[in-house]
A protein has these predicted regions:
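General structural feature for long, well-ordered alpha-helical segments within catalytic domains
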Residues: 17, 33, 68, 87, ...
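Glycine- and charge-enriched loop/helix tracts that form the active or gating conduit
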Residues: 1-87, 91-109, 113-127
Length: 214
């Protein structure tokens, strides 16, 4: 009956939809619900539909875009900002897909496209501004190169602050866990970066005035 009556969701207030979707995304069985009720989820968020079953044609990915997204959600802390960022981080991929002559799929510009789509979706669902800003930032930077190098990590901390930087590293790690086995070696890099963040902060190398010890 849920699948049959999914159109009724269109009559429910965005705020109510947001509460229920957030509960579902953060629940223990989120992956199963996302698989079994993808069509229902696509009523309030139709932008998800192109992801369902979309092949990536890339050795770094052994899953379609939707299954990869579910794997990332499963691998990340069940906290609203992180789970929503995981849901939306690759939403722009299908519209950015191109197939090279060698048969390898590419998604050039998908971070920008996903960011734009995430902003639109989160606004439509009446997200509070602070959460929306955090989620959009994570989507925007989810594909940036991360190395276990102090200088760029200090720059990240300076630009985004501790909490957002830690969230970003966690999303990168979850994203990698959702990719094929040949990418798994990168997990160690994110572990190293997390440790590096701890060391930098312990040394009180603070870069924003509000974080300076007075």
């Amino acid at each position: 009956p849920i699948h049959r009556n999914k159109h009724l969701l269109k009559g429910i207030a965005a705020e109510r939809i947001l509460v229920e979707l957030t509960k579902m995304l953060c629940a223990q069985g989120a992956a199963g619900v996302l698989r079994d009720f993808a069509d229902v989820l696509a009523v309030p968020i139709p932008e998800l539909t192109p992801m369902f079953g979309f092949p990536q044609h890339n050795p770094h990915h052994d899953k379609d875009v939707w299954e990869h997204t579910i794997a990332v959600i499963e691998s990340i802390t069940p906290e609203p900002v992180l789970r929503w960022a995981a849901l939306l981080h690759d939403i722009g991929k299908p519209s950015c897909f191109s197939l090279a002559e060698d048969g390898i799929g590419h998604f050039f510009g998908h971070s920008d496209q996903s960011t734009s789509m995430a902003e639109s979706i989160l606004s439509r669902l009446r997200f509070d501004n602070a959460s929306k800003e955090q989620i959009v930032r994570l989507v925007r930077y989810h594909d940036m190169p991360i190395t276990a190098d102090r200088k760029p990590i200090k720059r990240l901390l300076s630009k985004h602050g501790e909490d957002a930087t830690r969230q970003l590293i966690e999303l990168h790690k979850a994203d990698t866990l959702g990719q094929s086995a040949i990418c798994r070696h990168r997990i160690a890099i994110f572990e190293e970066v997390s440790q590096m963040i701890n060391e930098i902060l312990q040394e009180e190398s603070c870069f924003t005035l509000k974080d300076l010890a007075v």
